[in-house]
C-alpha cells in the first residue's frame, strides 16, 4: 500500500492525474494488492502501474493497458503481456502466469480508491476527515465500504474509469 501511495504522490507532484487503486478478492482473507492508475493524456486512458512488482501490462501489440482493460481481458481470456523486467521488490522475477493469471486475477474481483486523489489521502491526524471511497464492483455485490469511511459502489466501468478531465 505504501509504495503505491508514494508513487501516486510522485505522479501528482509531477502534474499527472493519478490514483492508488486497492485491488480486492471476492473474499478477503488477509490479502489484497494496491497499484496505481496514472492517466495518459496521449492515450486518453488510465494506465496500470505497479510499484511493488515494477510492472505494467500491454496487449499482444505492445499497447499499454489500464486496470479495467486488464481485468476485462483476463475475464475474457484475451492476451495480456507482462513487462519482461517485472519483479517483486527488485528481488524475484515475475511471470505473467503467476502475477497476472493467478495473483492479480484473484485480486481484481473489485477495485476501490479514494474519490479524491490527493497528498496524504489516508494520513490520519487530528481534524482531518477520512477520505470517501468509490468501488467498482460486479452486479449484485457490495464492497461494504471501509470501516469508518463513506463509500460508494458502482457497477459502471465507464464511470469509474472516466477521464479525470470530464465535467
Model-derived regions, located:
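Active-site neighborhood of thiol-dependent amide/isopeptide-bond enzymes
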Residues: 1-34
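His-Asp-centered catalytic microenvironments across diverse enzyme cores
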Residues: 28-30, 39, 43-167
